[in-house]
Curated annotation (Swiss-Prot):
UniProt-recorded Gene Ontology molecular function terms: exodeoxyribonuclease VII activity
Subcellular location(s) per record: Cytoplasm
Organism: Pelotomaculum thermopropionicum (strain DSM 13744 / JCM 10971 / SI)
Name of the encoding gene: xseB
Major place of residence: cytoplasm
Keyword Protease: no
Protein name as annotated: Exodeoxyribonuclease 7 small subunit
Length: 87
């Protein structure tokens, strides 16, 4: 039976957990290699989702002549909150 494809958030959460385990440094070599391989797979899943999102954004921001209108995005709401906290 084929494994269900993870959504972006699931893959990212698992990737973060794998990285945390690997950074701990207490794993036997074989387990570390297995987790590293899993992490590579998870990073590829995340990358596919991000590339797909980038393509969708390019389509949505295309002008009437088919050219892409590049718009600079401001900081995310979370980034703005972090900036305000430093003041």
């Amino acid at each position: 039976m084929a494994e269900k494809e993870m959504n972006f958030e699931e893959a990212l959460a698992r990737l973060e957990a794998v990285v945390k385990e690997l950074e701990d440094g207490r794993l036997p070599l074989q387990k570390a290699l297995e987790l590293f391989a899993e992490g590579i797979g998870l990073s590829r899943i995340c990358n596919r989702y991000l590339e797909d999102a980038e393509q969708r954004i390019a389509i949505l921001t295309a002008d009437e002549k088919g050219g892409v209108v590049l718009r600079e995005l401001g900081p995310s709401p979370a980034a703005r909150e972090d900036t305000n906290d430093e003041l």
